[in-house]
From Swiss-Prot:
Gene3D superfamilies: Knottin, scorpion toxin-like (3.30.30.10)
Disulfide bonds listed in the record: C11-C62, C15-C38, C23-C43, C27-C45
Record-given protein name: Toxin Tb2-II
SMART domains registered for this protein in UniProt: Knot1
Lineage, broadest ranks: Eukaryota, Metazoa, Ecdysozoa, Arthropoda, Chelicerata
Function: Beta toxins bind voltage-independently at site-4 of sodium channels (Nav) and shift the voltage of activation toward more negative potentials thereby affecting sodium channel activation and promoting spontaneous and repetitive firing. This toxin is active against both mammals and insects.
Description of its domains: Has the structural arrangement of an alpha-helix connected to antiparallel beta-sheets by disulfide bonds (CS-alpha/beta).
LCN-type CS-alpha/beta domain segment(s): 1-62
């Protein structure tokens, strides 16, 4: 699956002030995804395993 990475509060994980390539590494390391990029202003991940939670508009608390 794919989607936005979340922080510890369930909000989209911001990449606004992160260096280039940060989201790819973050998605691979923290979400076990195949890749990711900064879809300004948040990290978007591809190839996320089905058991890993990603941000969902329906359950958004931010």
């Amino acid at each position: 699956k794919e989607g936005y990475a979340m922080d510890h509060e369930g909000c989209k994980f911001s990449c606004f002030i992160r260096p280039s390539g940060f989201c790819d590494g973050y998605c691979k390391t923290h979400l076990k995804a195949s890749s990711g990029y900064c879809a300004w202003p948040a990290c978007y991940c591809y190839g996320v395993p089905s058991n890993i939670k990603v941000w969902d508009y329906a359950t958004n608390k931010c």
